[in-house]
């Protein structure tokens, strides 16, 4: 009986470590956080500088965050808006229960990028994420303050 208990604990430990590694290895949005983007964000948030941030990011869209999830467009006005197109299969992967829905995707994939981009910004905009299906119909939205998301 102790052998089975030990094997079970070992299996749980391996699964936990592999899931952690997968989360860290799959932070592809951070590839968009270039020195030119950091420089543009560090400037005062005038309309012109916000457009520059938009252009720097939108020239690289559509950008695959992971299989089935693509960053389609970024808009930076009063808030930092990200439009992500997601396949049903990928949405189902993240929607393990009804209450959390796609918050896990936003927490794992969007927050690290958002926090690193605006870490040195003089003004930190709120984050708005709109996840749309393949036809462009919104099925999940998230709105968060920098101070609540990035610590």
Regions found by a protein language model. Give the residues of each.
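Bacterial N-terminal signal peptides that target proteins for export
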Residues: 2-11
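Short, non-transmembrane amphipathic alpha-helical segments
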Residues: 92-122
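Generic alpha-helical secondary structure signal
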Residues: 47-51, 100
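Polar/charged, Gly/Pro-rich intrinsically disordered segments
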Residues: 26-42, 50-93, 119-151
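Sec/Tat signal peptide C-region and signal peptidase I cleavage site
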Residues: 21-25
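Bacterial N-terminal signal peptides
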Residues: 10-18
């Amino acid at each position: 009986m102790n052998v089975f208990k030990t094997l079970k604990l070992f299996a749980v430990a391996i699964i936990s470590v592999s899931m952690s590694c997968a989360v860290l290895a799959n932070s592809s949005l951070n590839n968009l956080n270039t020195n030119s983007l950091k420089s543009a964000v560090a400037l005062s948030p005038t309309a012109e500088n916000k457009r520059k941030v938009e252009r720097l990011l939108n020239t690289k869209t559509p950008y695959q965050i992971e299989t089935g999830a693509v960053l389609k467009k970024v808009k930076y006005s009063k808030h930092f808006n990200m439009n992500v197109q997601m396949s049903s299969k990928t949405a189902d992967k993240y929607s393990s229960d009804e209450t959390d829905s796609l918050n896990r995707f936003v927490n794992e994939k969007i927050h690290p990028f958002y926090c690193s981009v605006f870490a040195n910004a003089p003004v930190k905009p709120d984050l708005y994420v709109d996840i749309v299906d393949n036809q462009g119909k919104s099925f999940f939205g998230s709105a968060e303050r920098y101070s609540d998301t990035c610590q």
